[in-house]
Swiss-Prot record:
Keywords: Aminoacyl-tRNA synthetase, ATP-binding, Cytoplasm, Ligase, Nucleotide-binding, Protein biosynthesis. InterPro entries: aa-tRNA-synth_I_cd-bd, aa-tRNA-synth_I_codon-bd_sub2, aa_tRNA-synth_I_cd-bd_sf, Glu-tRNA-ligase_bac/mito, Glu/Gln-tRNA-synth, Glu/Gln-tRNA-synth_Ib_cat-dom, GluQ/Sye, GluRS_core. Monomer. GO terms for molecular function: ATP binding; glutamate-tRNA ligase activity; tRNA binding; zinc ion binding. Catalyzes the attachment of glutamate to tRNA(Glu) in a two-step reaction: glutamate is first activated by ATP to form Glu-AMP and then transferred to the acceptor end of tRNA(Glu). A motif ('HIGH' region) lies at residues 9-19. SUPFAM superfamilies: An anticodon-binding domain of class I aminoacyl-tRNA synthetases, Nucleotidylyl transferase. Belongs to the class-I aminoacyl-tRNA synthetase family. Glutamate--tRNA ligase type 1 subfamily. GO terms for biological process: glutamyl-tRNA aminoacylation. A motif ('KMSKS' region) lies at residues 258-262. This is Glutamate--tRNA ligase. ATP binds at residue 261. Pfam families: Anticodon_2, tRNA-synt_1c.
Length: 493
C-alpha cells in the first residue's frame, strides 16, 4: 500500500497548537511509512474565512519544519500555489466535482432534497429537546415525490441536500487508537451534504476529496469521531473502500479541559512571537498525546520520524504543560547557534529600548557575546529582556535591599579597590583573567566565598545572582567594568 495522508485545515485564522500536532502526526506517519503527506485547504464554510489565513498557515508549517511536497504550498516568492496530480487542493475550486458526486447520490436514492426552513428546523429541535430526545432532523422531506421536488425547485424554494441514512443500520469501523467502533443509524442525523449556497458541507467534501486523492489513512482530532459513521456510510453509498481512521486525543489545559484561546497562548504564532524555537515546540507537541517506547524526551525531527507510531498514541487527552515546554525549549536554546539566537533576540531588545536598530548592526558582536552568556538562562528568546540589563550602561542599580545591605559590609571598600587595581593593570580582560584575578584577591586580601564572589557580582552588575560572572565581565569589557566600580564607590557606598 502506498500510504497517503493529509492535513486539511480551514483558513479561519490562527494555527492552533492542536492543528500543528495533527499536521505533525500526519507528517511523521507518512515519513515512517515511506508515504506521501499532502496539505489540502478546506474552505467550504465561506462565512468563516479570514484573509491571509492560508499564507499564515503555510508559513507556520514551514517555520515548524512540517513540510509537504503536494497540495497547497508557498513558492519561493511567497505566493500560494498548488502542486500535485490530484488537484485542485482548495475545496472552493472543486465545486463542479462535488456537483458530479452529489448527483450520483441523488440518482441512487442515497441523498434527498430538503426544503425545510430554518424556523421549522429550530421548532423541531426545540420540541425534541423539550421531550428529552436527541435533537436531529425528523425526515420531513425524506419521502417527497419526484414531482413535489421538481415543483419546489421550479418555485425557487431554497433547499439543501441530505444524506439518506437507512433505519436501524449498523455502521462499523476500526480506529487505530480507539479500536473497533460501532454505531446505529437510528442514533444519527440525516446529515446535510450540500448547502443552499451550492457549497458542500465538510462531511461530504472530505469523503469525496479523500477518495479522489487516494488518502489511505485519516489522522485527525477526536472531535470527528461522532461524524465518522456518517463518513463511513458515505463510502458505502458510493461503493468505495473507506480509509483507515486515527482519531487523536484532545490537547487539554491543566484543568483537563480542552485547550482554548481564552486560557492564553494556543496559536503557533503566539509561541513564535515569544521566541520559542521551532525545534523545541515541535519536540514538545509531539509528546502531548504520544509516548515513545523508552523514556527519551528530547527528539530531533529525524529521530521523531523514526520513533513515531500511531500504536503509541494515547486514547485520553494530553495536558499541555507550559513548564515542560519551557524545559524542552531551553535545551534547544542552550545548544543553539549564537548568531541564530542573536538574530531572534534583536527585535525584543529593540522593542524594550536596550538598543536602536543602528546599534543592532554596529554592536552585533557585543550582542552575540551577550547572548552566548545568557542563553543558558533562557526558556524562550523573549526572556532575554529580563536578563539583559546587566550588560548595558556604566551605572548599576542594586535591585534589592539585601544587595544594598551586602555593599555595607566591612570588606566591600577593600574589594572595590582590589578589583579596580587589578583590572586597570590588565590589557586583556577575559573570563580566564577574571577567574585568576578572583583567586589572587582571595589569597592576597583573605576575602573568601560569598564575600568575594557575591560581592564582586553586586559591584559589577547590581545583582546577587546571575550568569557566570567571569563571562559577563568579558562581555562588558575593561572600560565598562572600571566605570561601574567607580560608580559604586562614588555613588552607592
Amino acid at each position: 500500500m502506498n500510504v497517503r495522508v493529509r492535513f486539511a485545515p480551514s483558513p479561519t485564522g490562527f494555527v492552533h497548537i492542536g492543528s500543528l500536532r495533527t499536521a505533525l502526526y500526519n507528517y511523521l506517519f507518512a515519513k515512517k511509512m515511506g508515504g506521501e503527506y499532502i496539505l489540502r485547504v478546506e474552505d467550504t464554510d465561506q462565512s468563516r474565512l479570514v484573509e491571509g489565513a492560508i499564507e499564515n498557515m503555510l508559513n507556520a508549517m514551514k517555520w515548524a519544519g512540517v513540510n509537504h511536497s503536494e497540495g497547497v504550498i508557498l513558492d519561493d516568492s511567497g505566493k500560494v500555489v498548488q502542486k500535485g496530480e490530484y488537484g485542485p487542493y482548495i475545496q472552493s475550486q472543486r465545486l463542479d466535482i462535488y456537483q458530479e458526486y452529489i448527483k450520483q447520490l441523488l440518482d441512487s436514492g442515497k441523498a434527498y432534497y430538503c426544503f425545510c426552513t430554518k424556523e421549522r428546523l429550530d421548532e423541531v429541535r426545540d420540541a425534541q429537546r423539550a421531550a428529552g430526545e436527541t435533537a436531529k432532523y425528523d425526515g420531513h422531506c425524506k419521502n417527497l415525490s419526484k414531482e413535489e421536488v421538481e415543483a419546489n425547485i421550479k418555485a425557487g424554494i431554497p433547499y439543501v441536500i441530505r444524506l439518506r441514512l437507512p433505519e436501524n443500520h449498523t455502521i462499523k469501523f476500526t480506529d487505530l487508537v480507539r479500536g473497533d467502533m460501532e454505531f446505529n443509524t437510528n442514533d444519527l442525523d440525516d446529515q446535510v451534504l450540500m448547502k443552499t449556497d451550492g457549497f458542500p458541507t465538510y462531511h461530504f467534501a472530505v469523503v469525496v476529496d479523500d477518495y479522489l486523492m487516494k488518502i489511505t489513512h485519516v489522522i485527525r482530532g477526536e472531535e470527528w469521531v461522532s461524524s465518522t459513521p456518517k463518513h463511513v456510510y458515505l463510502y458505502e453509498a458510493f461503493g468505495w473502500e473507506a480509509p483507515v481512521f486515527v482519531h487523536l486525543p484532545n490537547i487539554l489545559n491543566k484543568e483537563k479541559k480542552k485547550l482554548s484561546k481564552r486560557q492564553g497562548d494556543v496559536a503557533v504564532e503566539d509561541f513564535k512571537k515569544k521566541g520559542y524555537l521551532p525545534e523545541g515546540l515541535v519536540n514538545y507537541v509531539a509528546l502531548v498525546g504520544w509516548s515513545p517506547e523508552d523514556n527519551q524526551e528530547l527528539f530531533t525531527m529525524e529521530e521523531l520520524e523514526k520513533a513515531f507510531s500511531v500504536e503509541r498514541v494515547s486514547k485520553s487527552g494530553g495536558v499541555f504543560d507550559t513548564e515542560k515546554l519551557n524545559w524542552v525549549n531551553q535545551h534547544y536554546i542552550k545548544d543553539g547557534d549564537d548568531a541564530y539566537l542573536t538574530d531572534l533576540a534583536i527585535p525584543f531588545l529593540i522593542e524594550d529600548g536596550f538598543i536602536t536598530e543602528e546599534e543592532a548592526t554596529n554592536k552585533y558582536d557585543f550582542l552575540k557575546s551577550m547572548i552566548s552568556v545568557l542563553k543558558e538562562k533562557l526558556q524562550y528568546v523573549k526572556e532575554v529582556t529580563e536578563h539583559a540589563s546587566i550588560f548595558f550602561g556604566d551605572k548599576i542599580e542594586v535591585e534589592t535591599e539585601e544587595g544594598r545591605e551586602f555593599l555595607r559590609l566591612e570588606h566591600i571598600p577593600t574589594l572595590i579597590d582590589a578589583l579596580r587595581e587589578k583590572i586597570e593593570k590588565t590589557e586583556v580582560l577575559n573570563a580566564e583573567f577574571v577567574q585568576a584575578m578572583l583567586k589572587e584577591i582571595q589569597k592576597e586580601y583573605k576575602i573568601k566565598g560569598k564575600n568575594l564572589f557575591m560581592g564582586s557580582r553586586i559591584i559589577l552588575t547590581g545583582q546577587m545572582h546571575g550568569p557566570d560572572l567571569p563571562k559577563v565581565m568579558e562581555v562588558l569589557g575593561k572600560e565598562t567594568c572600571l566605570n561601574r566600580i567607580a560608580y559604586v564607590k562614588n555613588n552607592i557606598l
